[in-house]
Structures are given as structure tokens and as C-alpha cells.
UniProtKB/Swiss-Prot annotation:
SMART domains: MoCF_biosynth. It comes from the Bacteria. This is CinA-like protein. Gene3D superfamilies: CinA-like, MoaB/Mog-like domain. Belongs to the CinA family. It comes from Endomicrobium trichonymphae.
Length: 428
């Protein structure tokens, strides 16, 4: 079964991320389907008409997002109807629901004329209730002629705003597709940090080969790297749920045996959430002294609900003066070794440990670029310090990429050092 997605809106052609496509793709994958093609199209009628004709010819199910609003450039309904040579009509029930929407919110006593357009339904389509906004979805079964044959197709028209699209998709599109599903498909993600992508691929190769040795159609793999975090994505399908679950367990065990502590989490885990969980389990607290990251480590930590139970403070000391005044870094240290040095980063860690009275303290200083680098200290040079009541350490790194990349890699590495400290195994 071929499923195609058409996403409308001129904003998609100017660099805006298509989050609807990512969401729909992941939901379909979870129930054993995949999108054969995703097309972004603007608000020109002739372009959308062309894509409808192509999609109806090659796919069994076509899903659209966007173009159901009240303005002149919302043309999905009328264009789909024209392509299929069908009429549209104002649905009285939809008109009433739009009226109720405005009355409940005290926006207007009657429907604005412009919104009446959203009650236009393609003849023969089923209305899919929108409980969040004013534009209902539509589901239409139709026959599309290709040469001399007619094929039964299904069209779903969904709103563009994600908060409106998602409930309609989950309550209507998913149940419809599940009725055609002949098996079970489950997905998983392992998150890896501390080794290169090429090394990861080489290490897990035997595990993957063993997994697909019986029948490769049951197991699929993918590797994605971003800012030193490597995601190993896998999906397992079959008609027996026990087989699927056992295969996933074997995969996780196999990956764990070769990657060991370089695996930091699964599925929705992040370095910050895992570090936070370990701090809670060990009943420990942490503080940070940040220079080149400018508070981004603290931001990552405090993104996690409940982080106040283990996170004490973060001091952003960007200038030499603030390093001396707030953290007690010695002037001679800065003069003799510079702000970006192992000596300075160790004093920063010790300073914030004393200041916060936390169990662990970490510090970062580096040259994020694009200016400021020298032959001895190039852009990307970063030192991370670690201090507790027993000892102080420093770690040196040379990161590549843009300023944003270097800062993000520094944040991730600091959090991973914290994680490894909490599991008492260092691999740096």
C-alpha cells in the first residue's frame, strides 16, 4: 500500500521545518506503514493541482496537511474537488460548529464571513471533527481512472497547524490504516556518546548482521549523528508480538555488549535527563561554572522537570574579571596560562564547588569562534573541569564546526562527563 503526503503552504518552501511530515512519518512507522513520498507545495493552484494528479495516479492513500483555513490562499478543498471533478457544498453542521467556536470564545456573535469557507465539504467526503480549531478534516473514498482502469483511493485532508492536525490524525487516519495492517511494527532508538560514528557502525555490524540473518525484511536499521550524539534507530516487524518484543530485547542486549557505557539512553532520553536521573538515584547535587557555553548547560539541565532536586546553580563567568571575582580564579593563573587552559578550568570548578556547596561541580572554558583562535589555541579548543570533595580533574577537547556546533558539543560533553562520573566509569 502506497501512502503519499502532500504538505501545502508557501512557508514550507522558504526553509521552515516540516514538522507535520516528521510526526506523520513516525506515527505511520509505529503501526507498520511508511510514507512513499512527501511533497511540499506552495499556495499556487496549478502547482497543487499538478501534485494531486500525480499522487492520485501513483498512491493508494493521499494525506494532505494545510490549506483548510479561511483566507484566499487556502485552496486545498477546492483544488482537490476540481481534480476529482466533484462538487463542494456548505455543510450546515460544520457551519454551526464554527459558530459555536466563536461564541464560546466570545470572539464574535456570528461567524465572520471569511470563515464560512471552512464549512465547504467535498461531495461524498466524511467530515472529521476539529475539536481545537475551525477547519474540519475530510476523508474521501473515490475511484481514480488510470488508462482504462479505475482504482479505489482514499484522500485525507488535514489542517496545517500541528495542534489541530494531530488529534484528527490519531482519531481518524490511524484507526483507518490499522484496519489494513497485517502485522506489528515497533521502533526503538539507542543514544550513544563518546565514540565516532564510523566506530559505532563497525562495532554494531555483527549485531545487525545476526539480527537480519534469518529474514532481513523483519529488521531495519539507521544511524544518525548530530553534535557527537549518535542515534541507532531500529524497527522490528512481524505478525507475532512476542517475536517482535524478543527481537528488540536481543538487539538492545547485543548493542549493550559492544557499546557498553557509551550507550547513555533509549528512546526519549537525553544526556541531561539521564544525568538528572542518576543524580537523583545517587542523592547528589551538581553546579556549573560556564564561560564559552554562556549558561547553555544550565538551560539543558533545567529543561528537565524536577531538576531543582539536584541542580544547585550555574555561574556564567565570561570575562576574566568575573572568573576572579565570582569563582576565585587567581590573577596569576589567568596571566600565565590564559582563560582557556587546564589550570583555569580547574580553579573554576573548585570555585563553583565552594560557592555552591554541591557534591559535584563542572566548569567549561573554550574558544567557540569564529574569531579568537591562535596557532597554540585554535578555535574549537575546550577545557572541561570536574571537582568534588576528593579531587579536581581537567579534560581537553578539540571540537570542530560552527560556533553553535562547538558550544553544543561542549554542553553534551560536560553532561556526559557528569553521567560517567555518576556511574564511576570514565572513558576519556
Amino acid at each position: 500500500m502506497k501512502i503519499e503526503l502532500i504538505c501545502t503552504g508557501s512557508e514550507l518552501l522558504t526553509g521552515k521545518v516540516n514538522t507535520n511530515a516528521a510526526y506523520i512519518g513516525s506515527r505511520l512507522s509505529a503501526i507498520g506503514f511508511e510514507i512513499s513520498l512527501v511533497t511540499d507545495v506552495g499556495d499556487k493552484k496549478q502547482d497543487l493541482l499538478r501534485e494531486f494528479k500525480r499522487a492520485f495516479k501513483r498512491s493508494n492513500i493521499v494525506i494532505t496537511t494545510g490549506g483548510l483555513g479561511p483566507t484566499f490562499d487556502d485552496i486545498t478543498v477546492e483544488t482537490a474537488a476540481e481534480c476529482l471533478n466533484l462538487k463542494i457544498y456548505p455543510d450546515e453542521k460544520v457551519l454551526n460548529s464554527i459558530k459555536e467556536y466563536f461564541l464560546k470564545r466570545s470572539v464574535a456573535a456570528s461567524i465572520p464571513k471569511i470563515n464560512e469557507k471552512q464549512a465547504n465539504i467535498i461531495r461524498g467526503a466524511k467530515v472529521l471533527e476539529n475539536r481545537v480549531g475551525t477547519a474540519p478534516g475530510q476523508m474521501l473514498h473515490f475511484k481514480f481512472k488510470d488508462s482504462e482502469k479505475k482504482y479505489r483511493k482514499t484522500l485525507f485532508l488535514l489542517p496545517g497547524p500541528p495542534e489541530e492536525m494531530k488529534p484528527i490524525f490519531e482519531e481518524n487516519v490511524e484507526p483507518f490504516l490499522k484496519s489494513y495492517s497485517v502485522g506489528i511494527k515497533k521502533n526503538g532508538v539507542l543514544h550513544v556518546f563518546g565514540i565516532a560514528e564510523s566506530a559505532v557502525e563497525e562495532m554494531i555490524k555483527p549485531v545487525m548482521e545476526e539480527a537480519v540473518s534469518g529474514d532481513s525484511k523483519f529488521v531495519e536499521f539507521g544511524i544518525l549523528a548530530s553534535k557527537s550524539v549518535i542515534d541507532i534507530k531500529f524497527s522490528v516487524s512481524g505478525t507475532d508480538e512476542l517475536f517482535v518484543d524478543e527481537t528488540i530485547s536481543k538487539l538492545k542486549l547485543g548493542f549493550g555488549n559492544v557499546l557498553k557505557d557509551n550507550i547513555f539512553g533509549f528512546d526519549n532520553d537525553t544526556l541531561a535527563s539521564v544525568a538528572g536521573r542518576l543524580l537523583l538515584e545517587n542523592k547528589k547535587t551538581v553546579s556549573f561554572a560556564e564561560s564559552c557555553t554562556g549558561g547553555n548547560i544550565a538551560a539543558a539541565i533545567t529543561d528537565i522537570p524536577g531538576s531543582s532536586l539536584y541542580f544547585k546553580s550555574s555561574v556564567v563567568t565570561y570575562s576574566n574579571e568575573s572568573k576572579m571575582k565570582l569563582l576565585g580564579v587567581k590573577e596569576e593563573t589567568l596571566t600565565n596560562f590564559g582563560a582557556v587552559s587546564k589550570e583555569t578550568v580547574k580553579e573554576m570548578a573548585e570555585g563553583v564547588l565552594k560557592l555552591s556547596d554541591s557534591d559535584y561541580a563542572f566548569s567549561v572554558t573554550g574558544i567557540a569562534g569564529p574569531i579568537g583562535g591562535t596557532k597554540k589555541k585554535p578555535v574549537g579548543l575546550v577545557y572541561i573541569g570536574s571537582a568534588d570533595k576528593k579531587k579536581t580533574e581537567s579534560f581537553k577537547f578539540n571540537f570542530s564546526g560552527t560556533r553553535k556546533d562547538i558550544r553544543k558539543r561542549t554542553v553534551n560533553t560536560a553532561l556526559d562527563l557528569l553521567r560517567r562520573k555518576l556511574i564511576a566509569k570514565h572513558s576519556y
